[in-house]
């Protein structure tokens, strides 16, 4: 069971704004409904020069050997805009990304990411600019992301970030919707008991 306490990984800088879900994973690869196997289609039209994935685009940053095992994506505002396809999140996770840092995200993409345990971090534009300058200067740089302390540590500098306390608690404990439902199962049963009791009394009264 994966509990997100902290993560240290190589950062890949993708200096593009308004990356939509069709760029993250094109629509022709959405035929499966399980979450496995979508990583090979991530940023397909940018990573490859042909539809059969035979010609790798040498200029796209994810194809650089330095970022082969990158697990943190640094990008710009409005990441994940466009259609609400959850496959976009699945492809990022399946590729190996654990954290995405940007100045803003699409609301639906943010929700889908939280539900799939992909940590999204929102920072001010000046912090994003600083981090881009840093990773472009020191190629292959790693960040440490502490969800407990809500901070990114790089080069002995701590950059704090905000996250909803409930979401942080769920990620730290690896709770999903089923887990949360089970935690209030006794309340649900009590509610059902009271409701059905009321309905039975009403039926008896009207019969």
From Swiss-Prot:
UniProt KW Lyase keyword: yes
Single annotated GO MF: 3-isopropylmalate dehydratase activity
Disulfide links within the chain: none
Catalytic activity: (2R,3S)-3-isopropylmalate = (2S)-2-isopropylmalate
Family: Belongs to the LeuD family. LeuD type 1 subfamily.
HAMAP family: LeuD_type1
Function: Catalyzes the isomerization between 2-isopropylmalate and 3-isopropylmalate, via the formation of 2-isopropylmaleate.
Entries under NCBIfam families matching the protein: leuD, PRK01641.1
Protein name: 3-isopropylmalate dehydratase small subunit
Name of the encoding gene: leuD
